[in-house]
Amino acid sequence: MAAIFRLIAVALLFLGVTAGMAMTIVPHFLDRIYYTGPASGHFDTERFFNPDGDTDTAAPPTGGSRAGFFWNAMTGRDGRPVWPDAVPIHAAKPAELLQPLPAPPVFTVATPAQAAATPMVATWIGHASVLVQTPGLNILTDPVWADHSGPFGFGPKRVAAPGIAFADLPHVDLILLSHNHYDHLDLSTLKRLWARDRPLIVTSLGNDAILRSRGIPAVAADWDQAVTVAGRPRVGANTYWGRPVRVHVTRNHHWGSRWFADRNRALWSSFVVTLPGGNLFFAGDTGMGDGRWPVEAAALGPIRLALIPIGAFRFVTGQMASGSHIGPPQAVQVFERLRAATAIPIHWGTFRLSYEGYRTPPGLLKAAMACAGRTGFAPVAIGRPTAIAPVGAEAVATTTSDAVMVRCMDTPAVRVLR
C-alpha cells in the first residue's frame, strides 16, 4: 500500500512539474518581478541574460525534456550511482581570529609585510557555504543550514551535516549571496543570521527583493560594481588595518529562479573581496561560458583564496561539465586563469543534484590537477579549518587546453569514476 501511495504522489508531482514547465503564458499574479531598471549588456528590462550566450544554460540537463528529467530523478530510473545516506563529519568550533591591534579608536596602517602575513582561515561548511576568517572580519558564503535544498522543506536531502553547528558560528560580519537557487539562498538560515548578527549581506541585482520580503536587508549591486565594508569597531570604520575592504560583484555564467515563472528575474554573480593579505574570490554557481570571467576577477588584484565549484555537472555517462555547472577539469582551468595561490573545491558532497557518484568530483579534480601540473587546489574535509598560506609569487598565466585535458584524463582510473 505504501508503494501505491508513493507512486500516486510521484505521478501527481510529475503532472505538476509537467504543467509548470509547459506553461508559456504566465498570468501576472503568478510572476515575480524582483528588479526593474534600464537595459544593459546583460538585462533586457525584464530578465537578465548571460552576455556570452544562454543556449547552454537554457537547455534541459540531459538534452531531453525537463519533465522526463524530473520523472527519472523522482522514480530513481536515471541510473545514478548510489550515494551514502549520511556522511560522518567532525564539526568545527572556530575561535575568533584575533590579531593584536591598538585599542579603539587608534588604528595603525599595516606595512606591506604585515598585510601579507595577515592570517586567514577557511572552513568548508558544506556545498557552497564557507566561513572565511581574517582578524576582525568573518565572511560567510551562500549560507545553507537547511536539511533539504528546495521549497517548503522538499528537495534533495543533505547527506553531510553542516561543518559548523549554527550555535558555534562566530559573529558573522559579511555574507556573500551569489544567486537565488534554493541550494544557495536559504531564507530560513539568512533570517537566523540577520536576527543574531545583523551582517552586511551583499548580493546581485534582484535577490535583495527576495530577502526584503522576509524582513532581511541586503545590498544589491550589478556586475562591475563594488560595496565598501565597514568592519567591527576593532577594525575601524571602512578600513582594515588602514586599508579599505570592498566587495566587487563580478560576472560568472549561470541563471536564477525560485520557481518556474521567475527565471532570470534576478542576477547571478561571483565576488572578489579585497583584503590586505590578498583577495578572496567566490565563484558562486557557474558554468564556463566564454571563460573570460576568471581573468576579469584576477585583474582586481592577487587572489589568495578562491572558492571554486566542482560538482553537479554530470547528467549523462562520461559528461565532464554542463552549461550551468563547471566540472573538475574546467574548475582547474578557472583556477589557472585566476592565478590564485590556493583554492578550495565547493559545491559537491552535500546535496545530490546530478548523476555523478559521491566521490567522483574530488577524484576527477585530483586527476585534472595532475594533468595540469598544478598544486594548491585540493579537497578539504567538511568542518576542518584550513589555514590559508600567504600569497607567494604570482602563478604563470597559462591555461591547460581542453584537448590536453581530455587526452590526459582518458585513463582507466578516470573512466571508472561514474
PLM regions with names:
Residues 143-162, 255-263, 314-325:
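Acidic/histidine-rich helix-loop elements
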Residues 132, 142, 179, 186, ...:
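Divalent metal-coordination and catalytic microenvironments
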Residues 2-168, 203-284, 304-311, 366-384, 389-395:
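Metallo-beta-lactamase
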Residues 154-203, 299-307:
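Active-site metal-binding motif and surrounding structural segment of the metallo-beta-lactamase
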